[in-house]
C-alpha cells in the first residue's frame, strides 16, 4: 500500500512541476540582471512578475 501512495505522490509532483514550467516558458529570474523584471513581464505579455528565481505568468 505504501508503494501505491508513493507512486501517486510522485506522479502528482511531476504533473505539477511539468505544468508549472511548460505554462510559463520564460527564463528564470536572476538578481544579477537589473532588467529581469521587465524581461519577465515582456515574456508573459505584460503581466509577468518575478517571484524568487521564477518568472510567473498569472492567468495562464
Curated annotation (Swiss-Prot):
Keywords: Chloride channel impairing toxin, Disulfide bond, Ion channel impairing toxin, Knottin, Neurotoxin, Potassium channel impairing toxin, Secreted, Signal, Toxin, Voltage-gated chloride channel impairing toxin, Voltage-gated potassium channel impairing toxin
Disulfide bridge positions per record: 26-43, 29-50, 40-55, 44-57
Keyword flag Disulfide bond: yes
GO-annotated cellular components: extracellular region
Xref: Pfam families: Toxin_5
Reported tissue expression: Expressed by the venom gland.
Record propeptide residues: 60
Range of residues in the leader sequence: 1-24
PROSITE patterns (UniProt xref): SHORT_SCORPION_CHLORIDE (PS51200)
Location within or outside the cell: Secreted
Residues spanning the membrane: none
A molecular function (GO) term: potassium channel regulator activity
Family affiliation: Belongs to the short scorpion toxin superfamily. Chloride channel inhibitor family.
Domain notes from UniProt: The presence of a 'disulfide through disulfide knot' structurally defines this protein as a knottin.
Function: Toxin with unknown function in healthy organisms. On glioma cells, interacts with chloride channels (probably ClC-3/CLCN3) and MMP2 at the surface of glioma cells. This complex is then internalized via caveolae, thus inhibiting the chloride channels necessary for cell shrinkage and tumor propagation. Has been shown to weakly inhibit Kv1.1/KCNA1, Kv1.2/KCNA2 and Kv1.3/KCNA3 voltage-gated potassium channels. In vivo, induces contraction, severe paralysis and death in insect larva of Helicoverpa armigera.
Name of this protein: Neurotoxin BtITx3
Species lineage: Eukaryota, Metazoa, Ecdysozoa, Arthropoda, Chelicerata
